[in-house]
Amino acid sequence: MIKLIATDMDGTLLNAGHEITTMNQEAIKFAQANGITVVIATGRAFYEAQTPVAETDLKVPYICLNGAEVRDESFNIMSTSHLNHDLVHKITTALKNNHIYYQIYTNRGIYTEDPKRDLAIYIDIAERAGQKADVDKIRNNIQKRIDNGTLKVVDNYDSIEDIPGELIMKVLAFDADLSKIDQVGQALASSPNLAVSSSSRGNLEITHSNAQKGIALSAIAHQLGIDLTDVIDRKSV
């Protein structure tokens, strides 16, 4: 009997306007009404994941940043996993040497060196998911995140680790050259302390090896006393 469902967000729970569809809201509520716990499991940071949920009356736990951060329904942090200096250096050196653009995700925000490039990337993500990208809405959302401080524009990423309390949780890399980015991803994945995944063709999501959705989902199931045979990890609800 299914007791726990994990659902992704981009290209599944969300539409092209980055909103939770009415159909998916109703599906989540139906599952919850029948005693099933629904968890959002996403590569997004919490402040990105919670924004579309806040526009609804849903209450759900979150697995964020591919498992680097887990929060309960009341937003309390249950667990975190970050990248130390040596791992960050290993990742960024590989990306820079191959001229691959990337963003840095921390416990406090997302760092970018080029918001215009971010716009093109988010449009590409939507289109690769088979959606028609709402360019104006995506552009406005980027500006809104810059204004509220969750997207931080910097000249370079070198000083992030020097900020007190700032922990690097994930590196998100993009490149249109699929062969190149696949090669770099395979090289980084050979490190026993790194987990490398991809949410769409042309990107890499790099976290600590302890930060994986499957690990986080297993931990939530254990906490709730749910056997893994009663868990579904789905791309949509």
Describe each region flagged by the PLM.
Residues 237:
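Conserved small/polar residues in nucleotide/adenosyl-binding loops
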Residues 19, 47-48, 179, 212:
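Short alpha-helical
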Residues 4, 61, 232:
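Hydrophobic "anchor" residues on beta-strands that sit immediately upstream
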Residues 8, 13, 35, 195, ...:
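Conserved functional loop/turn residues at catalytic and ligand-binding sites
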Residues 3-17, 91:
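Asp-based phosphoryl-transfer active-site loop
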Residues 22-132:
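Active-site phosphate-binding/coordination module
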Residues 108-232:
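Conserved acidic, metal-coordinating active-site core of Asp-based
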Residues 1-7, 222, 226:
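Non-catalytic pre-domain segments flanking phosphatase-related domains
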